[in-house]
Regions:
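Short loop/turn motifs that connect adjacent beta-strands in outer-membrane beta-barrel proteins
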Residues: 29-35, 97, 135-138, 170-179, ...
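Transmembrane beta-strand segments that form the barrel wall of outer-membrane beta-barrel proteins
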Residues: 40-46, 69-80, 100-113, 139-149, ...
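Outer membrane beta-barrel transmembrane domains
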Residues: 177-213
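Outer-membrane beta-barrel "beta-signal"
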Residues: 205-207, 211, 231-243
């Protein structure tokens, strides 16, 4: 209980820091020290780490502000039939090839209060993520653990769901690339319904082609994902619009 109370204080502090940091980020942009960015993805199917979400094609916008090594951003997802909604806010800091990230996941249904932050009542999920990108080879490794919020096991205790993945990208040229990801979970977490200590949950292959339409670059990605734990697979297409 003492640990959970400390984590609760930590999360509330982080939330307040984010609110405090945002005006500074906006001021940095006005002074030329930051750069806004954004994109909108249209996907025929949304999958996250081998887990499907929604029942129809999905719109996924991103807006953010980059200030050197520091990033703050918002990411959202809504499907066309309104069976799935998600709004995330992230903070990240990059040092050379290592990126540390704190992500808050929230699913804004009408009954859920975005400001309900108590660990046993909130529908927020907070994850700490680390990603390392190798310098000489196009390989990355990522690890993430949920440290707070709506990630409870069958006993009602914090599960600390943990996921690792390794990925490889091969660029044929400036317009064509192929990537592959293998991901697995450790501990009895959300990826295996809080029942198994280990599970391979995400095997994904993607081919991306950069098209030019009216002098505008339009990346199109064809993906195939197989989740061995669920024994299910999906093929889907994503179009990306950046600004």
């Amino acid at each position: 209980m003492q640990i959970l109370r400390k984590v609760s204080v930590f999360w509330k502090s982080v939330f307040l820091l984010m609110m405090i940091a945002l005006p500074s980020a906006l001021a940095a942009q006005e002074s030329g020290k930051g750069e806004f960015y954004g994109s909108v993805d249209l996907s025929s199917k949304h999958l996250w780490r081998g887990i499907p979400a929604g029942e129809s094609p999905m719109v996924k916008p991103t807006v953010g502000l980059n200030m050197g090594n520091f990033d703050v951003y918002l990411w959202g997802a809504w499907d066309f039939e309104d069976t799935y909604r998600e709004v995330n806010i992230g903070l990240s800091y990059t040092v050379e090839n290592l990126t540390l990230e704190l992500m808050d996941y929230f699913y804004p249904w009408s009954k859920d209060d975005i400001f309900k932050l108590g660990n046993n009542a909130t529908t927020h999920q907070v994850e700490l993520i680390a990603t390392y990108e190798f310098e000489k080879i196009p390989v990355h490794i990522t690890g993430g653990t949920f440290i707070y919020g709506d990630d409870k096991n069958w006993k009602g205790k914090q599960a600390f769901s943990t996921y690792f993945e390794g990925g490889y990208t091969h660029e044929f040229d400036e317009r064509n690339s192929l990537s592959a990801v293998a991901g697995f979970s450790v501990g009895k977490g959300m990826y295996t319904d809080y029942t198994k200590n280990f599970g391979i949950v995400n095997l994904t292959a993607e081919y991306t082609r950069l098209f030019t339409v009216f002098n505008y670059d339009l990346p199109a990605t064809v993906s195939y994902t197989y989740n061995p734990y669920l024994e299910k697979s999906w093929a889907y297409v994503t179009l990306s619009f950046g600004f």
